[in-house]
Regions:
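RNA pseudouridine synthases
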Residues: 1-272, 276
């Protein structure tokens, strides 16, 4: 297996750019943040000018080629590569789009250090010889299934996160809720905060973070509704909290509604693959 080289960005310095500090060129022309620059400048091959390592204070001449490494697989800390199922629907040099299965955590944490989606992705990179990082762009709860975007390096993560709350990045979900919302289409604009004394639960709280969810009823039957929901913000448990707030908790939601194992063993929430 051939190990791929870490992702790099290149810039051929023009006459107008000649004499400017490399730090300035990285920020303005390649749109790298100070955080990414500080992270890569200490790598032996982090910032190169015509193939030679340079500092960010260097001032290149016209025609020279500036190259910066944006992926740092060795900077993933104690991430344990673990074999596990992955449903990859799109991949390029900067990102993955995966279809996340329900019941799978995204990030390692207490009690789950090696059985999360990040562990499975790290294993996939290792076996495929891909020199990339694992940076999920958005959050999906353990019980939620659907599409998840994962950046392969910090620069891609920053660029994609910058699009999260813009029209360029739409997050649309399908869910089944208890009862039939009235009106059948609307916007739930209610701030969300932690429930005092709970590490997990959230609630509508006037002192919480602003949160906005748009909903549209698609179909009804047996006292329930299939609802399309689009997030304008991205708070923890936002859809679940907002739907419970208007009196229509998601079917099977043990935390904000009523858990019914005779019907379903998880909350019925799925990220939709296509916008309306």
């Amino acid at each position: 297996m051939v190990q791929q080289s870490p992702r790099r960005l290149e810039l051929t310095v023009t006459a107008d750019q000649a004499g400017e500090k490399i730090d300035t060129l990285l920020r303005r022309e390649l749109r790298l943040s100070g955080t990414v620059i500080r992270r890569v400048k200490w790598l032996d091959d982090g910032i190169l000018l015509d193939g030679m390592r340079v500092t960010t204070a260097c001032r290149p001449a016209a025609g020279q080629v500036l190259s910066v490494r944006v992926a740092d697989p060795d900077g993933q800390g104690d991430m344990v590569p673990t074999p596990g199922p992955l449903d990859i629907v799109y991949e390029d040099g900067d990102l993955l789009v995966l279809n996340k299965a329900p019941g799978v955590l995204i990030h390692p944490g207490p009690g789950h250090y090696s059985d999360t989606l990040c562990n499975y992705i790290a294993w996939y990179y290792k076996k495929a010889g891909i020199a990339a990082d694992v940076h999920p762009v958005q959050r999906l709860d353990k019980g939620t299934s659907g599409l998840l975007v994962v950046a392969k390096h910090p620069h891609a993560q920053e660029q994609l996160k910058g699009q999260l709350h813009t029209p360029a990045f739409r997050r649309i979900y399908l869910a089944v809720c208890e009862g039939i919302p009235r009106p059948p289409e609307g916007c739930i604009d209610a701030p969300i905060g932690r429930v005092p004394g709970s590490l997990m639960a959230r609630q509508v709280d006037p002192a919480g973070q602003p949160a906005s969810t748009r909903y549209r009823v698609l179909r009804t039957g047996q006292g329930r509704a299939l609802v399309e929901l689009e997030l304008d913000t991205g708070r923890t448990h936002q859809i679940r909290v907002h739907m419970a707030h208007i009196g229509h908790p998601l079917t099977g939601d043990f935390l904000y509604g009523t858990e019914d194992h005779s019907l379903i063993s998880r909350c019925l929430l799925y990220t939709s693959p296509s916008p309306r």
